[in-house]
Amino acid sequence: MRGISVEEGSGNLYADLGYPDSESMLVKAQLVAKIAEIVQRRALTQTRTAEILGLTQPKVSALLKGRFRGVSEHRLLECLTRLGRDVHIVIKPTPRSRSNGRMTLSVA
């Protein structure tokens, strides 16, 4: 039997798969995961979630299944505020060790 080669990922699946917008996709995935967590914790139906978020039920279903490519980060942040969460955006200088900034998400 041949050995299986395992390569450690970068922590961003979308970057590992070569997506050009990998940072944005990772942030969206994290936002959707938080939305799904709130929906589950509150035991909301997809219909009730759609009413709260101002979306259609099929759109909520797609989001909760991880299909969010056509949804902006802004819209996902708005969904979180409609679910009773405050959103705080912080912009800070990039450390000297990096030339480009990056997007990260911290959830309290």
What are these language model-derived features?
Residues 74-90:
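DNA major-groove recognition helix of helix-turn-helix/homeodomain DNA-binding modules
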Residues 1-33, 97-108:
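N-terminal flexible/basic segments that precede or flank functional cores
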Residues 57-72, 77-78:
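Amphipathic, hydrophobic secondary-structure cores in small proteins
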Residues 36-38, 46, 61-66:
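Conserved interaction-surface patches within small, structured recognition/assembly domains
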Residues 52-54, 95-99:
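Glycine/charge-rich, flexible interdomain linkers and switch-proximal surface loops
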Residues 44-61:
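Short alpha-helical DNA-recognition segment
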Residues 28-44:
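Short, amphipathic alpha-helical "recognition" segments used to contact nucleic acids or chromatin
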